Amino acid sequence: MSDDRKQIKRALISVYDKTGLEELARTLDSAGVEIVSTGSTAAKIADLGINVTPVESLTGFPECLEGRVKTLHPRVHAGILADTRKPDHLNQLEELEIEPFQLVVVNLYPFKETVASGADFDGCVEQIDIGGPSMVRAAAKNHPSVAVVVDPARYGDIAEAVAQGGFDLAQRRQLAATAFKHTADYDVAVSGWFAQQLADDSVASAELEGDALRYGENPHQQASIVREGTTGVANAKQLHGKEMSYNNYQDADAAWRAAWDHERPCVAIIKHANPCGIAVSDESIAAAHAAAHACDPMSAFGGVIAVNREVTKEMATQVADIFTEVIIAPSYEDGAVEILQGKKNIRILVAEHEVPAVEVKEISGGRLLQEADVYQAEGDKASSWTLAAGEAASEEKLAELEFAWRAVRSVKSNAILLAHEGATVGVGMGQVNRVDSAKLAVDRANTLADSAERARGSVAASDAFFPFADGLQVLIDAGVSAVVQPGGSIRDEEVIAAAEAAGITMYFTGTRHFAH
């Protein structure tokens, strides 16, 4: 027998699912294992004619509060948590007249099944197990001394361990890992359900508070806006124009994030959550707007404009000449709002910038949560990029590449963005392969403005790696002078070879910016 096996002399069993219980109890009883059990589990074992110690006999305290309190007692948990490798623990158990457990068998109240059954709120809450997870976690923590089993499918392993003199340490560790995952999944189910209840309450509350929108993405969809805190697009103050729509809010948020991705004065023009144009300028915010608009004047018609600086009268005059749905900025120069108000329907918003912490997306059966994608990764800094091909870029060219890299984050994947002199000149978005995105970016650069072939001499950013050299080759053939991309493809060497052959500069960031 291995030295690290723990002979099973005493077992604690508390199970909601009684599958396999009879065979397990008979196996333990025939091996002379003392069985301590709770409630209906103890009753079931006793009905089989097997010796069992009810937990209340152990604790000297009756089950109470409709079974809510059964095992939450020091005489139970000390027996589970005592590290029998430590003489001090053994001495304390002896002083307290507590016997240690070597095996804990627990499965939990069927919370997921109760929710799936359509039970009401109180019914679901009643099926949140408290004592069970406490015992499981205690036993898993103390796996050097205790084996914990949470799945009836593993009862055969218990029988085998009893025959072999107990579970060895490696087996107990594996059982502990399984147990911690079991309780973690259980807690996620409970917390997710509670979050859903609160979300439902929030939507209902928002409707009652008058935050309902005219309709959703389409007229047949109901919609509302739930405002939290005092900053960001949701809490923007509207100075003029028609009521904000669901789509207005979506595009305003996309534009707001795109503009604030840049530290320099920036204007982003968005339509259907994709950039028509983004530009920065240290000369003036009006110059940035003119450059952003020039990227794709046709698409900018009816777009949403976001600005990360004060809107000047000069810029307001430019905007007033173009049909614009929404403009959002942190402030407006005296007289700028009056100029914009010359357009009856333009929605003029003023907002305080907020960096989102978490993004939430509803999916069938639940929701996805992730840390918001802002420029926080180390690879987002040009100083950390790796030169993969060609000569190192000049300071001016590197600044162009960094602008393109910051701008491409706001483009729906697959995303290729061409830039020149601090402005986008061609954007390829939302294609299911990177070659088509590259072709689209080049086509838009060369056909959507008065000056032909804007792609030639521009720089390019790709939100993810090129899986083959073909996407890069489209950019090379169009005359792109430098490229920044994450790298990381298994065919990086082919892509690098294509860049080297063309004599262009290419940097790897090591960071990806997918946007779906």
From Swiss-Prot:
A single GO BP: 'de novo' IMP biosynthetic process
Residue span, MGS-like domain: 1-150
Pfam family name, one: AICARFT_IMPCHas
One cellular component (GO) term of this entry: cytosol
Pathway: Purine metabolism; IMP biosynthesis via de novo pathway; 5-formamido-1-(5-phospho-D-ribosyl)imidazole-4-carboxamide from 5-amino-1-(5-phospho-D-ribosyl)imidazole-4-carboxamide (10-formyl THF route): step 1/1; Purine metabolism; IMP biosynthesis via de novo pathway; IMP from 5-formamido-1-(5-phospho-D-ribosyl)imidazole-4-carboxamide: step 1/1
GO molecular function (one): IMP cyclohydrolase activity
Record carries keyword Transferase: yes
Record key words, sorted: Hydrolase, Multifunctional enzyme, Purine biosynthesis, Transferase
Catalytic activity: (6R)-10-formyltetrahydrofolate + 5-amino-1-(5-phospho-beta-D-ribosyl)imidazole-4-carboxamide = 5-formamido-1-(5-phospho-D-ribosyl)imidazole-4-carboxamide + (6S)-5,6,7,8-tetrahydrofolate; IMP + H2O = 5-formamido-1-(5-phospho-D-ribosyl)imidazole-4-carboxamide
E.C. designation(s): 2.1.2.3, 3.5.4.10
Family: Belongs to the PurH family.
Domain-level remarks: The IMP cyclohydrolase activity resides in the N-terminal region.
Listed HAMAP family: PurH
NCBIfam families, per the entry: PRK00881.1 (NF002049), purH (TIGR00355)
Full protein name: Bifunctional purine biosynthesis protein PurH
Classification of source organism: Bacteria, Bacillati, Actinomycetota, Actinomycetes, Mycobacteriales
Gene name as annotated: purH
